[in-house]
Every structure is written in structure tokens, then in C-alpha cells.
Amino acid sequence: NLSLMDENGFIPADGLINANQQIKAMRAQQEAASKKAITSNGWTWLGPGNIGGRVRSVVIHPTNTNIMWAGSVTGGIWKTTNGGASWAIMDDFMTNMAVSTMVIDPTNPEVLYAGTGETGYYSDYGPPRGAGVFKTTNGGTTWTQLASTNTPDWYYVNRLAINPANPLILLAATDSGTW
């Protein structure tokens, strides 16, 4: 029996404490191992270093590799024009900054889409809820929410893809299905 409950349906306090200690130890071990792996494989950290959050998506301009956008679950969307030497926030006023996925229009690099909401992240407070899909037509300077994605079905957008044969077709994988 893997349950922590006793015969009366209660969970002993020390059982929860032990479980939390094990979780912290596993996370510390994973973090230490991942830092070793990155350094030993010759990767060089380029930033950004002045924000919090997890980068979940990086999009590279199709004809100028010095231009990139990074989507962070709690930090929003950032852009570099110098190959990552410096980054600038692009969406401080977007209604939701929980960016989990991004795509760039293959025919017009000024058009990008950002999906919001993060799944697979569990904490005492639950995963950061999104607000659907946002679009920019000016390289990220301004973003507009796609009105059709302003529903609970779009709280957690996992992946976006643009049909290469028809860039007007945007595909999305969410917690509630594929659209």
C-alpha cells in the first residue's frame, strides 16, 4: 500500500515532512546534475540574467540569426538583436506573461504568435494559467490577444505550429485538445 493514510484516514505529519524533504533533495540533485552537464558539454551562458522565470521557447529570425525572441513563463517575451549579448522586454503590458510556446511566420518574420499557460509544472499554487494566444505583426513591439482563444479551453497552450504551405493556418495543442 503506497498510501500515507493510516487506518483512520489521516496522514501523519511526519509523513508529509519526509515527502517534502525527499522532493527538495531530488530537486537539488537534479539541479546540480544539470549544471554539471551544461558546463561539461561546452555550453556558454548568454543570458538574460536580470529576470526570473523559465525560458520555454526560443524563436530565431529566419534570415538574421542575431535576432531572437525568448518566451518565459513568468518573465514574458524578450528580444535580442545582437545574438544574445543583451535582451529587451517586449511585452510588459501584455495581459498575460506566462509564455510557454512561440512560433514565427515563415513568410513574414514580423509576425509571431505566443501561446500562454504552463502545464506539467506543479507547485502548491498550481501551474501558471494563460490567456490563450497572442499575435504581433511588428516583431514583438505590440501584442494582441486572439479573441477566439479567450476561453478556458485555451488556458494552457502547450505548442503552436504554423502550416508552412499556408501561414494563415495556426495549429495549437492545448490541455483541452488540438485546434
Could you describe each region identified by the protein language model?
Residues N1-W179:
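Extracellular glycan-interacting surfaces
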